[in-house]
């Protein structure tokens, strides 16, 4: 069995519980993680032996989910990195894990190369990356506890949020407020690495086979 002791596997879910249980159990089938945790306000049935349950306040909306991911995930992680998965995004090819992924503070499936989308405050298209299956360092998780990371990124003239998701936590961390995380030393994976790590959409530079996925059109199961 593959051992990845540096990484805590996380899923945060109060809805879609059967799919969330499937996703985290599937991600544990051939990997022994540093820790594996199901986060939510109610303990689900059917978790495999490797998965611990840790209670959160109720996650009643997508905004609750996004806020928790930005400001509270750090409380659940004691390893150098965590892998955040979703009910519709999980490990599918454990053999494609690469320890070089740990060189980065954030990796997620690339977004499209579009001059009118995923624009940071300086109008630059940021392509990495999707949060639905994403590797994050403890350093990145701790940034909001050290400096101010604005939540209201859909207000004012500083932010350019074309197609970057308003309150979506991955848009906040990787687009709107990326400069804040980079100023704290966080390094985002290049597209060439992110394309090997995960896939969300079919893009010209997509890899056919990846370590994980999020919301792929293909029925992975």
Q: Regions from the language model: what does each represent?
A:
Residues 1-81:
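N-terminal anchoring/stem segment of glycosyltransferases
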Residues 89-122:
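Conserved donor-nucleotide/metal-binding helix-loop-beta segment in metal-dependent transferases, i.e.
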Residues 128-221:
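Catalytic core and acceptor-binding pocket of nucleotide-sugar-dependent glycosyltransferases
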Residues 14, 39-41, 85-86, 109-110, ...:
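Short His-Asn-centered micro-motif
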Residues 79-91:
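Short beta-strand-to-loop acidic/aromatic patch adjacent to the donor-nucleotide binding site
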Residues 21, 47-49, 92-96, 145:
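Short glycine-/acidic-enriched loop or helix-start segments at secondary-structure transitions
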Residues 30-31, 76-78, 98-102, 136:
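Short, conserved loop/helix-junction motifs that constitute active-site signature segments
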Residues 36, 87-88, 137:
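Generic structural signal for small/hydrophobic residues in well-ordered secondary structure
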